[in-house]
Amino acid sequence: MSSARFTYPFRYVPSPEIRHAAHSLIERIGSDESLRPLFAEGKMMGVLQTDAGFLYAFSGLAGGRAVIDGFVPPIYDYTDPEGYFRKTEARISAMTDGEQKSRMSAELQDWLFHRYRVSNARGESLDIAEIFSRRGLVPPAGTGDCAAPRLLQYAYSKGMKPLAMGEFWYGESRGGKVREHGRFYPACTGKCGPLLNFMLEGLEVEPNPMDREYHRREPETIYIDADIIVVNKPAGMLSVPGKLDVVSLLDYLRDRYGR
């Protein structure tokens, strides 16, 4: 059985059930002549255990396809050649480089992010642009196309309860990145940090092990008076809040001294 708490996706050890499901998927792809060529390029994949069974997803496109039987669909499918995105993208690509092309490209990307609408376990829904803007951020290109958000969004849309999750690499390494076939990796922080933090709201999630690490190694207050505080910060601890829900030195000081 999986633990009662859902997987903390940015730093985790996959459960035995997730490992077994991933191994079964790897074997299925390897033995299926129709699937094997689609993933030959190498692909990050994901497995989600729910109260209704297991779900599977791949990141981005596989063999140029966004929808493949046996895998959850993308949050938003922009690949229709007759759709607004592809037609506008083609017009922009044909333009001469310059300010207008850059502006139209940015507008199209923003249009796309407003099409990606995701939910959390509380039943709340926001689009990707809104989620990032609440943190004063602009979503990077490709946000929403990773396996983890696809899995969670599909589960929520079907009324399934997520229990455990893992993302692993299938195939050969590519693009200069060292990836090991079958090895599990944490969710990316740039694209998936703000997104998954929203989508996991309402679920009881495993604690961030880095938080536990910091609680064991509290900052040492060296000097304090009415105006200043001098603190020895543990190695690796963030000075100010970042993209992930990790305790920073500023969080610690505000909690302890109330200012």
List the predicted regions and their residue ranges.
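RNA pseudouridine synthases
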Residues: M1-R259
